[in-house]
C-alpha cells in the first residue's frame, strides 16, 4: 500500500525516476519444465538465506546442479577444494584442475579439454593467481600483470528512514520475496553530477506497532497481543552504489599465510574513494527530497561507514577486452593467452 503510494508520488514529481516491484528469480507457479528439474514453487517461508530445499528460487544448488546430474554427463565431487588450473607447457594449454580433498587433504588431478573457472569473483582470482607454471609464473594468463586488479563492488553504506501517517486502517499480510526498487536515475543519458556512474535503491514499508515487550513466556505473549492498533508506517531505503573498477583496488596472494589446505590466502586491498563519498551525499539529498515530497516525516539519514567486503556483488580482477595488453579475457570470456580456459562469473568485469 505505502509502496504503491510512494511510486505514485515519485511518478508525479519526477520524470526520470521509477519505483517498481523488485525483480527476483523465484517460481510463483509450477510448469512441466520446473517439475522435470525437481523444483517446487516458492512457499513464502521468508528464510531464503538458508537455501531453498524446494528450489523455489533460482540458484546453483537447487537448479543447475540437479539439472546437470540428470543428463548423466556430470560427476559431482564433494569435499573438493580447487587448488589450481593445470597448464601443460608442451601442449600450451590448460589440461585440467588440481583439487585438495577437504577431509583427507590429499590432492587429485582431473583432466579436461576445456576448463571453466566460475568460483565467485574473489575465489576465481585466487585460483588463477595460484595457477602458476614456467609459462605463467605470476598466474594463468597473467602476462600483463593485471590479474587481480580492477576489483569493484557495490556500496551499501547509506540508508534513509522515515515515518508516514497515512493508511492507518491498513497493515501487512503474508510474505513477499523482495522489496520495491528504484533503478538508477543519475548519469543515465548524460553526465549530470560531479561523480561518475550512479546508484539504485530499495524501498520498503511496514506498520510500526508500539508493543510492550516485557516479561517472558506467556506474559510476553500476552503483552505483545495487547496492542491491536498499528502505529505510523516505517519507511526506509538503502543505496546500492556503483564503485569504479580501479587498478589500485586489487587482490593478491599472501606470501606467508596459507589456509588449512595449503593454499595461499587472498590479500584484499580495496577502499572507497571521493567518487563514492559524493555518491552517498547525493543519495541523501535526492531521497530526502523524494521522501519530503511524498509527505514522509521524521526523516533520518545514516552512513554506517562499514568497510568494503561487508556487502555483496564483488566483481572484476579478470578484465575483459579486445587488447591483451590491457585485459585478460576476450569477448567470449576466454583467456587471451590460454584460450581453453573460460571465466564466466563476476570476475570478468
What is the role of each PLM region?
Residues 54, 71, 80, 84-91, ...:
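Glycine-rich loop(s) and the adjacent beta-strand/alpha-helix scaffold that form part
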Residues 20-23, 45, 83-86, 232-243, ...:
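A glycine-rich dinucleotide-binding beta-alpha-beta segment and adjacent secondary-structure elements
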Residues 27-33, 83-86, 106, 123-126, ...:
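Flexible loop/turn segments at secondary-structure boundaries
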Residues 101, 144-266, 274, 311-314, ...:
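FAD cofactor-binding and catalytic pocket of flavoenzymes
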Residues 35-36, 88-95, 311-316:
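A short, glycine/Asx- and small/polar-enriched loop/turn
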Residues 66-70, 102-109, 320, 326-336:
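A short acidic-Thr-Gly-centered motif at the start of a beta-strand
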Residues 1-82, 308-310:
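Conserved redox-cofactor binding core of oxidoreductases
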Residues 5, 9, 13, 67, ...:
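Generic, well-ordered alpha-helical scaffold segments in large soluble proteins
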Amino acid at each position: 500500500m505505502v509502496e504503491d503510494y510512494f511510486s505514485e508520488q515519485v511518478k508525479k514529481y519526477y520524470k526520470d525516476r521509477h519505483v517498481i516491484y523488485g525483480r527476483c528469480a523465484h517460481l510463483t507457479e509450477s510448469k512441466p519444465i520446473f517439475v522435470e528439474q525437481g523444483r517446487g514453487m516458492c512457499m513464502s517461508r521468508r528464510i531464503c538465506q538458508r537455501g531453498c530445499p524446494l528450489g523455489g528460487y533460482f540458484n546453483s544448488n537447487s537448479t543447475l546442479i540437479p539439472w546437470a546430474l540428470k543428463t548423466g554427463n556430470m560427476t559431482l565431487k564433494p569435499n573438493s577444494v580447487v587448488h589450481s588450473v593445470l597448464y601443460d607447457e608442451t601442449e600450451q594449454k590448460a589440461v585440467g584442475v588440481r583439487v585438495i580433498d577437504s577431509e583427507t587433504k590429499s590432492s587429485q588431478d582431473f583432466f579436461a579439454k576445456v576448463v571453466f573457472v566460475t568460483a565467485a569473483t574473489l575465489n576465481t582470482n585466487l585460483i588463477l593467481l595460484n595457477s602458476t607454471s614456467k609459462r605463467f609464473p605470476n598466474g594463468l594468463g597473467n602476462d600483463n600483470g593485471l590479474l587481480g586488479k580492477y576489483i569493484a563492488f557495490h556500496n551499501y553504506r547509506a540508508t534513509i528512514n522515515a515515518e508516514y501517517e497515512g493508511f492507518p486502517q491498513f497493515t501487512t499480510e503474508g510474505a513477499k520475496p523482495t522489496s520495491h526498487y528504484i533503478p538508477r536515475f543519475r548519469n543515465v543519458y548524460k553526465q549530470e553530477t560531479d561523480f561518475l556512474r550512479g546508484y539504485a535503491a530499495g524501498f520498503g514499508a511496514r506498520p510500526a506497532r508500539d508493543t510492550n515487550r516485557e516479561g517472558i513466556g506467556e506474559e510476553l505473549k500476552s503483552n505483545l497481543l495487547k496492542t491491536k492498533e498499528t502505529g505510523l508506517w516505517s519507511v526506509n531505503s538503502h543505496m546500492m552504489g556503483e564503485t569504479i573498477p580501479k587498478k589500485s583496488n586489487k587482490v593478491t596472494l599472501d606470501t606467508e599465510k596459507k589456509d588449512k589446505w595449503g593454499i595461499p590466502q587472498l590479500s584484499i586491498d580495496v577502499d572507497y574513494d571521493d567518487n563514492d563519498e559524493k555518491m552517498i551525499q547525493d543519495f541523501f539529498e535526492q531521497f530526502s527530497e523524494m521522501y519530503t515530497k511524498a509527505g514522509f516525516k521524521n526523516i533520518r539519514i545514516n552512513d554506517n561507514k562499514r568497510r568494503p567486503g561487508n556487502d555483496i556483488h564483488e566483481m572484476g580482477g579478470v578484465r575483459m577486452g579486445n587488447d591483451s595488453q590491457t585485459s585478460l579475457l576476450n569477448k567470449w570470456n576466454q583467456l587471451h593467452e590460454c584460450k581453453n580456459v573460460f571465466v564466466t562469473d563476476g570476475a570478468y568485469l
